[in-house]
Amino acid sequence: MELGPLRVLTVLLCLAPVFAGLFISMDQPTLSIQKSVLTITTNDTLNITCSGQRAVYWSWPNNQSSVEKRLAVTGCSEGPFCKTLTLLRVIGNDTGDYRCLYGDSQAATTIYVYVQDYRSPFVTSVGDQLGIVYITKNKTVVVPCLGTVSNLNVSLHAKYPEKVFVPDGKSISWDNKKGFTIPSHLINYAGMVFCEAKIDNESYQSVIYIVAVVGYRIYDLTMNPHYQVELAVGEKLVLNCTVRTELNVGIDFRWDYPSIKERRATIRDLKTTAGEIKTFVSTLTIESVNLSDKGRYTCAASSGRMNMKNSSYFIIHESPFIHLEKMENVVEMKLGDTVSIPVKFKGYPPPEAKWYKNGKVINANHTVKLGYALVITEATEKDAGNYTVVLTNPTNKMQKRHTFTLLVNVPPQIGENALMAPVDSYKYGSTQALTCTIYAVPPPAAVLWYWQLEEECTFSPQKVRLGANPYACRKWKVISERKGGNQVEIKQRVVTIAGKTKTVSTLVIQAANVSALYRCMATNRAGSSERVISFHVTRGLEINLQPRSQLTEKDNTSLQCTADKFTFEKLSWYKLSTHVSQTPFGGLPMPVCKNLDALQKLNATVSNVNGENVTLELILRNISLQDGGDYVCIAQDKKAKTQHCLVKHLTVQEPLHPRLVGNLENQTTNIGETIEVLCTVNGVPPPNITWFKNSETLFEDSGIVLKDGNKTLTIRRVRKEDGGLYTCLACNILGCKKAEAFFSVQGAEEKTNLELIILVGTAVIAMFFWLLLVIILRTVKRANGGDMKTGYLSIIMDPDEVPIDEHCERLPYDASKWEFPRDRLKLGKPLGRGAFGQVIEADAFGIDKTATCRTVAVKMLKEGATHSEHRALMSELKILIHIGHHLNVVNLLGACTKPGGPLMVIVEYCKFGNLSAYLRSKRSEFIPYKMKSARFRQGKENYTGDISTDLKQRLDSITSSQSSTSSGFVEERSLSDVEEEDAGSEDLCKNPLTMEDLICYSFQVARGMEFLASRKCIHRDLAARNILLSDNNVVKICDFGLARDIYKDPDYVRKGDARLPLKWMAPETIFDRVYTIQSDVWSFGVLLWEIFSLGASPYPGVKIDEEFCRRLKEGTRMRAPDYTTPEMYQTMLDCWHGDPKQRPTFSELVEHLGNLLQANVRQDGKDYVVLPLSVSLNMEEDSGLSLPTSPASCKEEEEVCDPKFHYDNTAGISQYRQGSKRKSRPVSVKTFEDIPLVTTVKVVQEENQTDSGMVLASEELKTLEEQDKQVKIPFSTLAPSKSNESVMSEASNQTSGYQSGYHSDDMDNMVCSSEDTELLCAQEASPTLPRCAWPGIYSPAPVASLPL
């Protein structure tokens, strides 16, 4: 078979490496000296030639011999690949291997050369002063002491301790070329070793070698943190791998982790030594973890001969979180047991756990341990309650909470068992009651009574000594159907004794006919208890103890044995020498007196022989403990001559000093709450307890209750003056003991009390029936309440127009302070509706911390409300909380925000509606001054000064109502609170409207706006329609839900075709969309115009268009209203200053209006008020009242007046601002022209505008026109003439009493005649005390549309 050329080439290529290896091995360099060992002497010359097939090189020993200066490598003539090594003057340290090799080091020829030097027989390494020998356990170690002379006699010396080792031919040997070989365990103790050789009896030493023991054992490898570790994205990961080894061990660390390829981690190693342990720490760090870093981190350590590894697992969360798992809502345990209630949750980072009991923080003690589990050992009844655990994330302060109820079940305890059971007999035929008082938690479902005939039970005196039940009754029968041996009846009731609820079961025996044993048994889930009562019936024989049953030493008492003198004779008293009949389960009298020898006869006297009975009285004086025991009365039956005995046990107690059980604790409480303090005292005789407050004796009074023998002190409706030092003093015959505690009362004072509530309630109820009678007689339909009650809707805003997100996110809501239960809210009739919500009148039970209910207004969303609308109402709630509490602001009372029902905002209810409607309704009753009788005029001189003083006090009272952030359901402080002497003032509807009222309304609105400004809030829609009238002439500002923080968004702009109240808006607001506090001052000036025009619409007859806005900016202003004074009109002009900075502040307005109010009252006292001429004429002609407007008229009345009071010398508010840089207002200003007085002409606004200046849709305008056609406006003759536009505005005003105009969409207005107004006021003056009962469950009333 022939092979092709290709196949031959392939075979040759495969065999090439084999031939190359053989060629290399055969082609080793050759030396000129053909020996493996060459011996020469010192100072000789070493000359060796090396030849090869390629270039050759020489290597020689690297000893301390300065060989480079004496050695030369040169070429030779034998060939191109030949080199000669020449070493001159050789020395002993030149001993070693000399090698000739090719450049690839694959082939070499070696010759070992001894340079014999007997004066230095050991080779010294280069630079070695001290050598190091590394020793490993259980290994053979070589000490490299090489010899320059062959066949030396060498030994190894070790220090310390000193020891010499010589070669034994086995484990210990010496080799010239290698050194001294010895097992490591023989020299591991040594600090140093060296070799020693003897030549001609002289010893030569090698260099000294330090012995270094090298270990390998790894004791452990730990990871910190270990197991499962949690981190959040962005946090730092630090993982320590710690290795503990024996000494002289080197460790090599290897890490494996998820992001090892990205090399995002840094690793640092550290080693320390402590004692016999060496510690290595390798730290892996990732500065900012991400989700890709999740996984297992493994650390491996190697010492060469030993390996070990460990790992930790890291979980990376995207953000911190807390997830609370489902837990039990009710936990039950038995009295004295131990319970552990764990909190099941997942969260990162580990949250902080805080525990609360009944709303108060609890701390750990010897019986309560806290953490992620609540552990209670040896539970007592005090441990029961509502527990709340609050988990707080320390990073983002996220909280999760869980509340559960801990019930401590108490086995039934029958109180009578703890007392000494009396050994009494019961008279035949008498009615008796046997009682079992049971305390148990939970209360026993039922208390069962059993009975057994006395003769059917056996009595064992031996069991008495053991404290066991001495009665053995086998046939206990349940008492039923009124049968229990005797005619019986079972009664059961629940009582509260010393703060504990107990069940009292009473077995009433109608007629004691049969002696029997009765047993009561109570059972609950924690256990059961029973009491056995001996019921022994006697005929004509009984024992009484006088004066009481509990006796102490040195008392006097008497035992009276009474018997039927026709049945018994020979009565005598004896005393038993031993007590045999008394048991803890009830005593059994001795039925027959058989053992009279055991009795000691006592001297007694017959005290009563009258009638059918005879009484033998045993008198015991100054008794001692020895007088206690069983006393027996023996009587002999006259007919049968048998003896009958009755036993009475007398217990004498040793007097004990009073002893307090526990101590009183200092308390801090809020005004209006209830304090209950228990002073538990033991002592014999029972101590008498007296309470003191600040060292003065405390007696029961209104709100102060003493019960349980004065042990319990209860202070209801705590007031400020109830604070102080309270002392409980307990005294008996041996002395006294006292306990003290200091009570602190905090919070604002509420001056209401029970007596005032009863008085006002009675008066209001009487008024209610009187008004009901008037309504029946007059039969006039009630005015539409929608005009008066819908203003509460104002804060429910269009979420598309107002950015409420910031409100919701930044303003807090504290549910613990503001949340009100829905089941305590009874919804009533609707008050009004808006585009997004509705307002319902409701009764709130207990919202003001009392047991009564209060009428409130509740804001709700309509059905199908969107999430944005829900957030808008929530935003309004938070704004109300942020604004706080003030007398002249519609205040928040509470809210219902919890899931399970609609969102509700509870605010104050103002029954008289908005100020605009009220002023219009009172036009026919307006008088500029108060009417005074002749009797008043006679005493005018004395009274005039009192008016100013009284008003000043009222102003101070009102202005002292400082703002505060309300902390819960606190009842509004009205004028009746700060002015108690005015509590019985007449109803607003019965009083005429006066100039003083108008100024007072203005003053109060200014005061409320001053408060809102102090809270950094801007109203932006201040108008009479947004001012509500409450009791006692108090006005309250509403519709500040759009108020904004002036430091957060001062340039807020409402976009789109929203309806804006242009007539009330300042020029800078109209043109620049800038809302500030000073723009609210402009609106306040317009509000003053409304007030002093008695509710007319501003800018009468003026078309609200671009021309109006231009003229307003140029300085044109409204004319003076019909009922104003020069001072008030000048104040309006000051508020309408074109430069916002020149307008007065609300604080300045408060001061100015307060002064005007005082001045007006002084003028009122003088029957002098300056009014426009038209008003004066109307008053004189129509009412028959004269106004003294001249000095002559003043003299007729013998009064003083100032005829200089007129427009020309009127000063504005600037006179009240000293140092003001603001210029005075001009005396005259340009005003808008009035329309002619044509009352029959119907004026309709063009371009879909209403009097408010709001842009209306055409559909709304048509509705307004239809309403206007239906409404007629009657006026009394007392009302002054007005423009046609003012008349029209009363019927077409776009706002209603409780609802701003641009929120209302389905309400109309009605202005009543004087007769209608009187009836309306009578109907509105409903009783102030709620006419409601406690609601069972929350059930929203249906909201019906109000009639148009």
Swiss-Prot record:
- Compositional bias ranges of the Low complexity kind: 958-967
What residue spans carry the region label Disordered? 958-983, 1280-1302
Domain (Protein kinase): residue spans on this chain: 825-1155
Q: Which residues are glycosylated?
A: 43, 47, 63, 93, 138, 153, 201, 240, 290, 310, 365, 386, 513, 556, 603, 613, 622, 666, 688, 710
Recorded hits in PROSITE patterns, A to Z, give:
IG_LIKE, PROTEIN_KINASE_ATP, PROTEIN_KINASE_DOM, PROTEIN_KINASE_TYR, RECEPTOR_TYR_KIN_III
Q: Which residues cross the membrane?
A: 757-777
Q: Which residues bind ATP?
A: 831-839, 859
Q: Where does tissue-level expression of this protein occur?
A: In all endothelial tissues during onset of vascularization. In later development, present in lung, heart, intestine and skin.
Membrane topology, as annotated: Single-pass type I membrane protein
The EC category is transferase
* EC code: 2.7.10.1
Q: Give residue ranges for domain Ig-like C2-type.
A: 43-106, 138-202, 220-312, 320-405, 412-534, 540-651, 658-744
Q: List the keywords (alphabetical).
A: Angiogenesis, ATP-binding, Cell junction, Cell membrane, Cytoplasmic vesicle, Developmental protein, Differentiation, Disulfide bond, Endoplasmic reticulum, Endosome, Glycoprotein, Immunoglobulin domain, Kinase, Membrane, Nucleotide-binding, Phosphoprotein, Receptor, Repeat, Signal, Transferase, Transmembrane, Transmembrane helix, Tyrosine-protein kinase
- The signal peptide annotation in the UniProt record is 1-20
GO biological process per UniProt: angiogenesis; cell migration; cellular response to vascular endothelial growth factor stimulus; endothelial cell differentiation; positive regulation of angiogenesis; positive regulation of cell migration; positive regulation of protein phosphorylation; protein autophosphorylation
Q: Which residues lie on this side of the membrane: Cytoplasmic?
A: 778-1348
Q: List the disulfide bonds.
A: 50-100, 145-195, 241-299, 436-520, 561-633, 679-728
Q: How is its activity regulated?
A: Present in an inactive conformation in the absence of bound ligand. Binding of VEGFA, VEGFC or VEGFD leads to dimerization and activation by autophosphorylation on tyrosine residues.
Q: Which residues lie on this side of the membrane: Extracellular?
A: 21-756
Functionally, this protein is described as follows: Tyrosine-protein kinase that acts as a cell-surface receptor for VEGFA, VEGFC and/or VEGFD and plays an essential role in the regulation of angiogenesis and vascular development. Promotes proliferation, survival, migration and differentiation of endothelial cells. Promotes reorganization of the actin cytoskeleton. Binding of vascular growth factors leads to the activation of several signaling cascades. Activation of PLCG1 leads to the production of the cellular signaling molecules diacylglycerol and inositol 1,4,5-trisphosphate and the activation of protein kinase C.
What does the entry's free-text domain comment contain?
Answer: The second and third Ig-like C2-type (immunoglobulin-like) domains are sufficient for VEGF binding.
Record-stated family: Belongs to the protein kinase superfamily. Tyr protein kinase family. CSF-1/PDGF receptor subfamily.
User: What is the name of the protein in this document?
Assistant: Vascular endothelial growth factor receptor 2
Source organism per entry reads Coturnix japonica (Japanese quail)
